[in-house]
Amino acid sequence: MPRRREVPKRKVLADPKYGSELLTKFVNMVMRDGKRSVAEKIMYGALERIESKGHETPMEVLETALENVQPKVEVKSRRVGGATYQVPVEVRPERRTTLAMRWLLDAARKRGETTMALRLAGEMLDASESRGAAVKKREDTHRMAEANKAFSHYRW
């Protein structure tokens, strides 16, 4: 690894419709094979679906969903003298949101609704109410960290 200067983070442009960088990042994660317009259609469709269900602003639902899915701690494998320990470590803020988005998307892709926009809307609504597969994933991660608390002194 080079030990020179730290590579600057690239700024993501705010979303044209809602003016949110978070939404742009989410669209980038939904996007496959560089098809941004398709990803935007899915994302906006999901947000419109949330709005039509009579909820507060869809961006608030998205933010609460991400807040409820963000993990505080995770486990990382650490090899110590032939044995591999699952060491609990705190998650950096940027990684928290990235993991939350990834887990929301994975959970949405596994749902049974007909279109991806409906699946994503359903998963976001579930997550904003602290239920659903994405929230379960976070709870499982926290449970793993809690179970391996004894190895926390192996942190690096």
From Swiss-Prot:
InterPro entries: Ribosomal_uS7, Ribosomal_uS7_bac/org-type, Ribosomal_uS7_CS, Ribosomal_uS7_dom, Ribosomal_uS7_dom_sf. Keywords: Ribonucleoprotein, Ribosomal protein, RNA-binding, rRNA-binding, tRNA-binding. Coiled coil: none annotated. GO terms for cellular component: small ribosomal subunit. One of its GO terms (molecular function) is rRNA binding. Signal peptide: none annotated. GO terms for biological process: translation. It comes from the Bacteria. HAMAP family: Ribosomal_uS7_B. One of the primary rRNA binding proteins, it binds directly to 16S rRNA where it nucleates assembly of the head domain of the 30S subunit. Is located at the subunit interface close to the decoding center, probably blocks exit of the E-site tRNA. Part of the 30S ribosomal subunit. Contacts proteins S9 and S11. PANTHER family: RIBOSOMAL PROTEIN S7. Belongs to the universal ribosomal protein uS7 family. This is Small ribosomal subunit protein uS7.
